[in-house]
């Protein structure tokens, strides 16, 4: 048993050291979970060689970290990774009990240690959503021979003033999605965005969408 565990640990170290360079494996985020799965011998097969016999078990073992850590066990699709880098993908969620007064108190004045507080106009925050709305409206009109249009009571009609701002907080270091959610809840944030390179953004109560779509974590940019 001891020999098997030692072999798995050695395999883990070799795997992480090689894949972190070739496939941008996030060792800081994935090492613990990948180690557990390798020690249990749940991720030993190689899909690249046509053997995916362990893929389901490995996916279940990594759970919510599968998408971020599958490259550490050689199971990600290289083509999809190159087409959509981790910094271009993110997970967002609304928090159930935001505390706007707490979030404002923590983000006014000097920024909390190891964070970046960023304030952006709502127009900038909503730019992508606005472009998407215009595209969908055009598509809708085309499909209906320009006889109907999407209703204009969209979210943007209420936010055309330039004085409204959206405040977000980035953490300097890479964190897991669970930590990101916990940190943002403890700050009183209303939402969070967790980029798939492990950069965390807490989103304030004035933000209408999900904050900025740019990675700005000082020590977690790639």
Curated annotation (Swiss-Prot):
Annotated compartments:
Secreted
Q: Does the keyword field hold Protein biosynthesis?
A: no
- Signal peptide location in the record? 1-24
- What residues are glycosylation sites in this protein? 51, 145-146
State the source organism's domain of life: Eukaryota
User: GO cellular component terms?
Assistant: extracellular space
InterPro entries documented for this protein: Tsg
The alphabetical list of record keywords is: Developmental protein, Glycoprotein, Secreted, Signal
Q: Name one GO biological process term.
A: regulation of BMP signaling pathway
State what the entry records as the consequence of deleting this gene.
Morpholino knockdown in embryos exhibits variable outcome. It may result in a weak ventralized phenotype or in dorsalization.
Tissue localization of expression is: Expressed uniformly in early embryos.
Q: Name one Pfam family in it.
A: Tsg_N
Q: Does the keyword Transmembrane helix apply?
A: no
UniProt similarity note? Belongs to the twisted gastrulation protein family.
Q: What does this protein do?
A: Involved in dorsal-ventral patterning. Appears to function predominantly as a ventralizing factor, through its actions as a BMP signaling agonist, acting through both chd-dependent and chd-independent mechanisms. May also antagonize BMP signaling, probably via formation of ternary complexes with chd and BMPs, resulting in dorsalization.
User: Would you tell me the protein name for this molecule?
Assistant: Twisted gastrulation protein homolog 1-B
Q: Which organism is it from?
A: Danio rerio (Zebrafish)
Gene name of the record: twsg1b
